């Protein structure tokens, strides 16, 4: 679209790409995640309903999706505002807010946070995973889904005039459901019409990212403008990682700060540490992919906020960047990952 070409679209309007600054490409500022509640282990039912307290923090960190209140990030606007002010003070410029239809997107709240903190906030269009799809969504044709997504970018979403600046995170499960496949096809069609950035939440299986890209390609999507999220919990084998990287998407490591013994959504996954994530970044850089790497924290629960003893939105800037530099990643490469790559991805074609 000529009106958006060469621009970035935030909840406060269009800006020039050079205004973005350091960017976290996968975060949530207000959402609810009740759709993904995991029943607590026998004997832990009381903990799952108890207030968030320091004495329960370790249990909460290991079982974040079994605590009802923890899934309600939308209750913490004031805490998130404080976090964003700290993020800006630490050198942050932009947050890509990945909350889509199905997990309580709140565009007026995002606009308010952007106004009050000075942080650029970019909202996401589209739909999350199948379990959050309404009957109305399931009945929509690919053409209708495309029209909805395009309208959320061009005119505003959820009955507001606040416009989304990316499509996503578009949610997929494993195996990908028919409803999710339609949304992926609609995403590709909308991207073709708009020239806009897309970001994907793959199912929790190492085959999922490749399958998503295949569906998008067959539907005419622009893979060079597409981000594959959550690679830190999806692809571990270096050979498989390079095979996927050759497909041309952005490669996002977005769970920095999340270090758990057992990953509740897939016990077969050994969640990497932040040090291991940094080593993965270094490997990809050495293999020639420094122009395709993005990083973030994917904060989507209360316990990840500093208010509750979590790492917060400034963790990468304060802690991970020094670690990257100490492990031989150059300042120029860090700037590519935090500034240049997000800028290229977020700019409409």
Curated annotation (Swiss-Prot):
GO biological process, one term: taurine metabolic process
PANTHER family recorded: PHOSPHOTRIESTERASE-RELATED, PHOSPHOTRIESTERASE-RELATED PROTEIN
Organism this protein belongs to: Danio rerio
Record EC number: 3.1.-.-
Predominant location: cytoplasm
Annotated Gene3D superfamilies: Metal-dependent hydrolases
Family the entry assigns: Belongs to the metallo-dependent hydrolases superfamily. Phosphotriesterase family.
Catalytic activity, as annotated: N-acetyltaurine + H2O = taurine + acetate; N-propanoyltaurine + H2O = propanoate + taurine; N-acetyl-L-methionine + H2O = L-methionine + acetate; N-acetyl-L-isoleucine + H2O = L-isoleucine + acetate
Domain of life: Eukaryota
Cofactor: record remark: Binds 2 divalent metal cations per subunit.
Binding positions (a divalent metal cation 1): 26, 28, 169, 298
UniProt-recorded name of the protein: N-acetyltaurine hydrolase
Chain sites annotated for binding a divalent metal cation 2: 169, 201, 230
Subcellular location: Cytoplasm, Cytosol
Entry GO terms, CC: cytosol
Cofactor(s) this protein cannot do without: a divalent metal cation
Lineage: Eukaryota, Metazoa, Chordata, Craniata, Vertebrata
GN (gene name): pter
Protein's job: N-acetyltaurine hydrolase that catalyzes the hydrolysis of N-acetyltaurine into taurine and acetate. PTER also acts on other N-acetyl amino acids (Met, Ile, Leu, Val) and N-propionyltaurine, but at lower rates.
Keyword Acyltransferase: no
InterPro entries, sorted: Metal_Hydrolase, Phosphotriesterase
Keywords assigned by UniProt, alphabetized: Cytoplasm, Hydrolase, Metal-binding
Gene Ontology molecular functions: N-acetyltaurine hydrolase activity; zinc ion binding
């Amino acid at each position: 679209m000529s009106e958006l070409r060469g621009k970035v679209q935030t909840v406060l309007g269009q800006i020039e790409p050079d205004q973005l600054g350091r960017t976290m490409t996968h975060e949530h500022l207000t959402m609810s995640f009740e759709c993904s509640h995991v029943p607590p282990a026998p004997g832990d039912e009381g903990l799952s309903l108890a207030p968030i307290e320091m004495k329960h923090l370790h249990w909460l960190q290991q079982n974040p999706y079994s605590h009802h209140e923890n899934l309600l990030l939308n209750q913490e606007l004031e805490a998130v505002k404080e976090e964003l002010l700290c993020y800006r003070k630490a050198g942050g410029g932009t947050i890509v807010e990945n909350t889509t239809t199905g997990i309580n997107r709140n565009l007026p709240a995002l606009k308010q946070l952007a106004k009050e903190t000075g942080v650029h906030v970019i909202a996401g269009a589209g739909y999350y995973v199948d379990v959050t799809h309404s009957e109305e969504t399931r009945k929509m044709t690919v053409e209708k889904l495309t029209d909805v997504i395009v309208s959320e970018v061009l005119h505003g979403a959820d009955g507001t005039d606040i416009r989304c600046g990316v499509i996503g995170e578009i949610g997929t499960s494993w195996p990908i459901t028919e409803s999710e496949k339609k949304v992926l096809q609609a995403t590709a069609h909308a991207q073709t019409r708009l020239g806009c950035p897309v970001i994907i939440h793959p199912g929790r299986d190492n085959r999922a990212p490749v399958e998503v890209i295949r569906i998008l390609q067959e539907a005419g999507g622009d893979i060079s403008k597409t981000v594959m999220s959550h690679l830190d919990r999806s692809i571990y084998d270096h050979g498989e990682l390079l095979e996927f990287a050759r497909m041309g998407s952005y490669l996002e490591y977005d769970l920095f700060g999340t270090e758990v013994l057992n990953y509740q959504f897939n016990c077969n996954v050994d969640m990497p540490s932040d040090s291991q994530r940094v080593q993965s970044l270094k490997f990809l850089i050495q293999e020639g992919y420094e122009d395709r790497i993005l990083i973030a924290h994917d904060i989507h629960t209360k316990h990840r906020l500093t208010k509750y003893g979590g790492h917060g939105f400034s963790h990468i800037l304060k802690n991970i960047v020094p670690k990257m530099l100490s492990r031989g990643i150059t300042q120029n490469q860090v700037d590519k990952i935090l500034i240049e790559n997000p800028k290229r991805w977020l700019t409409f074609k």
